UniProtKB/Swiss-Prot annotation:
Family per record: Belongs to the thioredoxin family.
Membrane topology according to the record: Peripheral membrane protein
Stored PANTHER family: THIOREDOXIN-LIKE PROTEIN 1
Name used for this protein in its record: Thioredoxin-1
InterPro entries: Thioredoxin (IPR005746), Thioredoxin-like_sf (IPR036249), Thioredoxin_CS (IPR017937), Thioredoxin_domain (IPR013766)
Complex and partners: Monomer. Part of the heterodimeric LMA1 complex together with the proteinase inhibitor PBI2. Most of the thioredoxin of yeast is in this complex rather than the well-studied monomer. LMA1 binds to the ATPase SEC18.
Taxonomic lineage from the root: Eukaryota, Fungi, Dikarya, Ascomycota, Saccharomycotina
Superkingdom of origin: Eukaryota
Bilayer-spanning residue ranges: none
Site (Contributes to redox potential value): 31-32
Active site residues per record: 30 (nucleophile), 33 (nucleophile)
Record domain Thioredoxin: where: 2-103
PROSITE patterns hit by this protein: THIOREDOXIN_1, THIOREDOXIN_2
Disulfide bond positions: 30-33
């Protein structure tokens, strides 16, 4: 399951966890974001040891800017509040590899 962030504080709390947290930075107008969404959902089922979230860059632009996200989709992977991997673009193979390497 992929959970939608509503606030910056939800984001901050989630990434501080002692487990892998995968955040999909997307925009509703972004075609590649829509294309990759079902794959992210599938990865969330394949990797239950990780938590999966999505963040609308138009709703939480300050969070996107703070994390230097300028292209969508961008997936950031965090552990203990630190970024451990970044995948820019709709690249399922690279996303899966980043998750597997850090799960």
């Amino acid at each position: 399951m992929v959970t939608q962030f509503k606030t910056a504080s939800e984001f901050d709390s989630a990434i501080a966890q002692d487990k892998l947290v995968v955040v999909d930075f997307y925009a509703t107008w972004c075609g590649p974001c829509k294309m990759i969404a079902p794959m992210i959902e599938k990865f969330s089922e394949q990797y239950p040891q990780a938590d999966f979230y999505k963040l609308d860059v138009d709703e939480l632009g300050d969070v996107a800017q703070k994390n230097e996200v300028s292209a969508m989709p961008t997936l950031l992977l965090f552990k203990n509040g630190k970024e451990v991997a970044k995948v820019v673009g709709a690249n399922p193979a690279a996303i899966k590899q980043a998750i597997a390497a850090n799960a």
